[in-house]
């Protein structure tokens, strides 16, 4: 079993987006710690299976971040289950999880399931609109969410998601200072080695996604954060 606490860098691939064989090979051979498959729109059983089968040829951990029940399938090393803490819709807190457990609970290996305390911070992002997230958050709000995740819910992961834009470093830093047990994931807008380095100095693990499809060379440079210690 892989130890996710050792992961500093994850590439996130969207099954609804095209990636060439050459680019996928470069991503999977880049020394990233893991590949995560996940997205918001058009995540289907077919495109998840297709992408999974392409990535499975490489010897690195493979994660499915669950966005709907229909696309859940065996074959992944881990299943990351988001609970969107700042969503106004209970479905994105635990409603979808409840339905998944009713359907698959008898066959789940819970050692493979990681619950993520998500906070969505970009009001203009698809994920914010889809999850009906309240993104008007102060630093104090984020600190309170961090305390909730770390001390009360005791979730293994807190994911600060800026989805499409580079986040407020001071707010991410404030969250980090309240997490003593929970692992801090940061995702959103990382498009350069400098931004990757800046966020990796704060978060335990950075997630790099969109830049893969815009500039593969810049995406690959973000892996250099692994050369330095946090």
UniProtKB/Swiss-Prot annotation:
InterPro entries referenced in this protein's UniProt entry, alphabetically: GGGP/HepGP_synthase_I, GGGP/HepGP_synthase_sf, GGGP_HepGP_synthase
The organism's place on the tree of life at top rank: Bacteria
Substrates-to-products reaction catalysed: sn-glycerol 1-phosphate + all-trans-heptaprenyl diphosphate = 3-heptaprenyl-sn-glycero-1-phosphate + diphosphate
EC category name: transferase
Pfam families reported in the protein's UniProt record: PcrB
Keywords assigned by UniProt, alphabetized: Lipid biosynthesis, Lipid metabolism, Magnesium, Metal-binding, Phospholipid biosynthesis, Phospholipid metabolism, Transferase
One GO term of the biological process aspect: glycerophospholipid biosynthetic process
CDD domains cross-referenced by the UniProt entry: PcrB_like
Binding site for sn-glycerol 1-phosphate: 12, 159-164, 189, 209-210
Biological pathway: Membrane lipid metabolism; glycerophospholipid metabolism
Record-listed E.C. numbers: 2.5.1.n9
Keyword ATP-binding among record annotations: no
Any GO molecular function: heptaprenylglyceryl phosphate synthase activity
Keyword Metal-binding: yes
Binding site for Mg(2+): 14, 40
Cofactors named for this entry: Mg(2+)
Family the UniProt entry places it in: Belongs to the GGGP/HepGP synthase family. Group I subfamily.
Quaternary structure (record): Homodimer.
Function: Prenyltransferase that catalyzes in vivo the transfer of the heptaprenyl moiety of heptaprenyl pyrophosphate (HepPP; 35 carbon atoms) to the C3 hydroxyl of sn-glycerol-1-phosphate (G1P), producing heptaprenylglyceryl phosphate (HepGP). This reaction is an ether-bond-formation step in the biosynthesis of archaea-type G1P-based membrane lipids found in Bacillales.
Protein name: Heptaprenylglyceryl phosphate synthase
């Amino acid at each position: 079993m892989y130890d996710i606490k050792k992961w500093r860098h994850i590439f996130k691939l969207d099954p609804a987006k095209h990636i060439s064989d050459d680019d996928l090979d470069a991503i999977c051979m880049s020394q990233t710690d893991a590949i995560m498959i996940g997205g918001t729109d058009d995540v289907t059983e077919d495109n998840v299976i297709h992408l999974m089968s392409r990535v499975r040829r490489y010897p690195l951990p493979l994660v499915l971040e669950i966005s709907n029940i229909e696309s859940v399938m065996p074959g992944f090393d881990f299943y990351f289950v988001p609970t969107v803490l700042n969503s106004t819709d209970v479905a994105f807190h635990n409603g979808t999880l409840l339905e998944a457990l009713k359907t698959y609970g008898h066959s789940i290996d819970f050692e493979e399931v990681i619950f993520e305390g998500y906070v969505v911070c970009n009001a203009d992002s698809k994920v914010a609109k889809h999850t009906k997230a309240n993104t008007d958050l102060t630093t104090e709000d984020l600190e309170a969410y961090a305390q909730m995740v770390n001390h009360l819910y005791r979730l293994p992961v807190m994911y600060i998601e800026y989805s499409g834009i580079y986040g407020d470093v001071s707010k991410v830093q404030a969250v980090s200072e309240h997490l003593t047990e929970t692992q801090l994931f940061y995702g959103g807008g990382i498009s350069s080695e400098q931004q990757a380095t800046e966020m990796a100095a704060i978060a335990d693990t950075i997630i790099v996604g969109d830049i893969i499809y815009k500039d593969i060379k810049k995406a690959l440079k973000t892996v250099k954060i692994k050369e330095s210690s946090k």
